[in-house]
Amino acid sequence: MDIDPYKEFGSSYQLLNFLPLDFFPELNALVDTATALYEEELTGREHCSPHHTAIRQALVCWEELTRLIAWMSANINSEEVRRVIVAHVNDTWGLKVRQNLWFHLSCLTFGQHTVQEFLVSFGVRIRTPAPYRPPNAPILSTLPEHTVIRRRGSARVVRSPRRRTPSPRRRRSQSPRRRPQSPASNC
């Protein structure tokens, strides 16, 4: 049975696999980010969104996996076997949890549509031969205008849409030849 955890979010496991392995942040950094940004939503009783639920499940899976590794490390005497098991877990299950947390945190931060566009454009870039690629890779770095920004100790603040500042008006030189001459000044 082929279960794709990203299908209900309009993405796929294949799209996430186009991203290089070193693209995803360390697992501890992702866990810290998730708990810092969404601790209330993750520990609360209310259902916030499917992304919050997916993050909650990924954190529970990683906790259980960490307990299993700790138990195995305590009960295995061979240092080499212990190292191989930890490396295997980090390279397989750890990577899946990192991908999962990154995807759902990015969807909450940037919006699901933006993340999907990024994954597709990155996938197209990777499949395009190097001589035909545009010079810059797709970047997922700008916050959309509807992003919710939380400040410590305060309620949610919704960011207002960005407005263009008016361009400064040019001042004309006040040199003598440009000053408007009034008829009375000619006398």
Swiss-Prot record:
InterPro entries: Hepatitis_core, Viral_capsid_core_dom_sf_HBV. A motif (Bipartite nuclear localization signal) lies at residues 163-180. SUPFAM superfamilies: Hepatitis B viral capsid (hbcag). The keyword Transit peptide does not apply. Residues 151-187 are annotated as: Disordered. Residues 151-180 have a biased composition (Basic residues). Residues 181-187 are annotated as: RNA binding. Residues 160-179 are annotated as: 3 X 5 AA repeats of S-P-R-R-R. The keyword Repeat applies. It is found in: Virion; Host cytoplasm. GO terms for cellular component: host cell; host cell cytoplasm; T=4 icosahedral viral capsid. Pfam families: Hepatitis_core. It comes from the Viruses. The modification Phosphoserine is found at residues 160, 167, 175. Sequence repeats lie at residues 160-164, 167-171, 175-179. Keywords: Capsid protein, Cytoplasmic inwards viral transport, DNA-binding, Host cytoplasm, Host-virus interaction, Microtubular inwards viral transport, Phosphoprotein, Repeat, RNA-binding, T=4 icosahedral capsid protein, Viral penetration into host nucleus, Virion, Virus entry into host cell. GO terms for molecular function: DNA binding; RNA binding; structural molecule activity. HAMAP family: HBV_HBEAG (MF_04076). This is Capsid protein.
